A protein has these predicted regions:
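Short, structured segments at the rim of ligand-binding sites
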Residues: 1-131
């Protein structure tokens, strides 16, 4: 939200300890296509130079990686095969690693992920790390 406000604010806004999620990078890409001056999305510092006007563009935003992960986990748990499109494997690499540890077979190519599971998952250790 700060990036969105800063785009139309006068002067330069520096955001420190910024979120680094892929969606933030995608937001920067979208805003830049509209004429905004945003640098550093995906890094800890984002610099936004306010502009007077933004322009309409056509843009295909990132697909929801949380939603894709939910469907992958459901298929892993219930057994069967699922294919997701529009989510890049590097954006959910930790989840895919754990699903493989669970015993799922996973194939990735570009923005396509195919998961197969017999529904008999192995237990794995999960640890949440904070940045």
């Amino acid at each position: 939200n700060i990036i969105l406000a800063a785009v139309k604010a006068e002067g330069t806004t520096v955001i420190r300890n910024a979120a680094k999620e892929p969606e933030i990078v995608d937001l920067q890409n979208f805003l830049v296509r509209m004429g905004a001056k945003v640098q550093g999305a995906g890094e800890s510092t984002v610099v936004v130079e306010g502009v007077k006007q933004l322009y309409g563009v056509e843009y295909d935003p990132l697909k929801d990686r949380i939603e894709a992960g939910t469907f992958l986990i459901a298929a892993a748990t219930c057994g069967g095969e699922i294919e997701t499109k529009g989510v890049f494997s590097e954006n959910i690499a930790a989840l895919l690693h754990k699903l493989r540890e669970n015993g799922c077979k996973i194939h990735t190519k570009n923005d396509k992920i195919i998961l197969w599971s017999d529904g008999r998952l192995k237990s794995v250790d999960l640890v949440r790390l904070c940045n």
